[in-house]
Every structure is written in structure tokens, then in C-alpha cells.
Amino acid sequence: LTNSYKFVGPSISSRLTQENFDLTAIKEKSPIYISLGTVLNQAIDFYKLCIKAFGNTEHTVVMSIGGQTQLDELGEIPENFIVKTYVPQTELLKYTKLFITHGGMNSTNEALYNGVPLILIPLSADQPIIAEQVTNIGAGISLQMQTLTANQLNEAANQVLNNPSIHKAVANIKESFQKSGGYQKAVDEIFKFKSQYGI
């Protein structure tokens, strides 16, 4: 590649949220985190499937259901589940052991930046391509929403959590992302370019 390109990796920053979420409650529990993002998150059947897959297991599960699903629509919530409308995702991912996600670009980058392996369930747009790339680099696995079962999701979680090669791949990507500089590196390169060419 020529000097015309500067790769600075993803730009990761905290997101503002109105949700009251106590991170101290989960810091020592290394939860599984489940979210379908902020756009196509009206998925009651999927959330119920997650409860069936992980309810009353040894895992602590944090599930973000967005603003289009009401908590009472999900029925009884198991004691090992924390279900919220929204959560501080970038902060939560620092303590997460597995992220089950739709595979949006932001969510995927934020997970890998924090060294979190992925189960991707792509829904639309670029998500199938992102899911394919994540599986190609060994940082997670991809499942299909249309045929997904609770047993399949539980088995996939165990597969990811107990696979050393996935954890190694994720650790390598985390190191690469965190060394790349992000938006601060981009700003530095822009000012360097301006200075170099007297702009």
C-alpha cells in the first residue's frame, strides 16, 4: 500500500444512555451480553429463545431489548438475567465474556476492541458480510435467525467460550485495534498532512 492510505482502526467512544445500569453488579460475573442493536430490535421470539437457552444456567446474562419490546411481553425473567431497554454497551463490553449480536459494524468493532468473542446473527444490510468476515478470521461463529433454536444457541455459546483458537484470534485483533490509534490517530494524521503540504 502507498502512503495515500492510513489505517487507524475503529473509532471507539462511550455512548450516552438514559438507562440506569449498575456496572458494579456484573463486573465480577463476566456476563454473556445479548443485543440486536438500536434499529431492528423488535424481536420478542428471539429474546424468549435466549431466555430458554440460558435461563437458570451458570451464566449471568445481560440482555438489551431496545425500546420496541416491553419487558412484560417476555414473561417470567430468570434470576440470572438482567434485562434492560438499553445498556452502556461500550462500558459493559469491558467485562463481557461473549457477545451475541446482530453483527452491526459498531457492535462488532466494539466487541473486538475489548477482546470479546462473538456469536453473530445477521439480520440485514452489511451484517451478513461482517458475520462472514468475523468467522473467517476465527473471532466467532455465525448463526441464522430463521432456523435458530434455544439448544443451538446454547451449544454455540459453549463452543465459543471453550475454544482456545477463537480466544487467541480475538486477543490478536484486540491488540491490533488498540494499537491502531482510532479517531485520535486520524486527527493526528490530518494535522500532519496539513503541516506537510502547507494547507
Regions inferred by a protein language model and the residue ranges of each:
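Catalytic core of nucleotide-sugar-dependent glycosyltransferases
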Residues: L1-I199
